[in-house]
């Protein structure tokens, strides 16, 4: 199967700043009960995804392009760059910020945690 990539502009995600572009590589239906989505996320300059907690899900991020700040479960601010992997476990919180003048591009996958009803 070949289909067009589904895209959506979302504003102030999880209380963050500005607009981000969500590109859905796999939708919830295509995840076959294993998670919510696999996507490419573009954070334009000076935008962010606000800090939030994952309940019943885990989320690995892979940084493809640009540089940013990963805010971990303890609110520690950690610089990230291409090739870095950020893993958010069930019950942990995180946020992602792009304080630069270039796009920050990540691949993220929201998967159901252990014991999560699918």
Residue ranges and their predicted role:
Residues 24-26, 39-55, 90:
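Conserved short histidine dyad/triad with adjacent acidic residue
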Residues 40, 60, 75-78:
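Short, surface-exposed secondary-structure edge patches
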Residues 1-36, 50, 117-118:
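A short, N-terminal "cap"/entry segment at the start of jelly-roll beta-barrel domains
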Residues 74-90:
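Short acidic-glycine-tyrosine-enriched beta hairpin
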């Amino acid at each position: 199967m070949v289909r067009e990539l589904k895209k959506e502009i979302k504003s102030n995600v999880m209380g963050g700043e500005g607009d981000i572009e969500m590109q859905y590589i796999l939708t919830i239906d295509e995840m076959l009960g294993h998670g919510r989505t696999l996507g490419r996320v573009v954070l334009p300059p000076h935008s962010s995804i606000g800090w939030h907690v994952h309940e019943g899900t885990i989320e690995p991020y892979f940084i493809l392009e640009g540089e940013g700040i990963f805010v971990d479960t303890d609110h520690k601010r950690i610089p990230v760059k291409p090739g870095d992997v950020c893993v958010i476990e069930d019950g942990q919180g995180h946020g992602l910020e792009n304080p630069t003048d270039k796009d920050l591009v990540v691949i993220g996958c929201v998967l159901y945690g252990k014991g999560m009803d699918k």
